[in-house]
């Protein structure tokens, strides 16, 4: 199937996504991701309000072995593509987390805002907002996730996984290229900034 055929198939699944069916299937997700998709632990991502296309892709990537998440072993192995879209539709319709950052480290937050809004051209790091939007909601049609309100701990671990090559399932591995140019402080800064981006 060519790229046009794949895009058409994804559009069909998205159009047919049944959030009610997804809600039933998502009951097993609650232990880690919370009943409404807001995780009680910073180690696991908030799914509420996330772009449907991004969530469906992640579920299918985990199922197909294109993204390794040990905690998800066996959880989505039997999901059909439609199941993935249904669960994604359920979480996408939930209210996103409204995170708050601490003002304790103003310098760290300022660096995070700088990276998010303008990037760091001296390091070859583009602005995060270029793909994730100025408000951090992401771009569903491009499968770019929303970052607003995401747990800082999870965001840092995700950036570290992209930087190390442990995760490589972003479009054209663009996140691997970007994250590999970021220092630990850069990752911490942008993660804390997006937590409070509303």
What is the role of each PLM region?
Residues 18, 25, 51, 58, ...:
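Stable alpha-helical elements in mature extracytoplasmic
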Residues 40-46, 62-105, 140-146, 164-197:
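Axial heme c-ligation environment in periplasmic c-type cytochrome domains
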Residues 10-11, 15-65:
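The feature marks the first
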Residues 8-26, 40-41, 93-121:
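Electrostatic cytochrome c docking/interface patches
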Residues 1-16, 60, 184, 195-198:
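N-terminal export/targeting leaders of redox proteins
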Residues 10-13, 96, 100, 111-118, ...:
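Predominantly soluble domains enriched in secretory-pathway, periplasmic, or organellar proteins
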Residues 22, 29-35, 87, 125-134, ...:
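The canonical Cys-X-X-Cys-His
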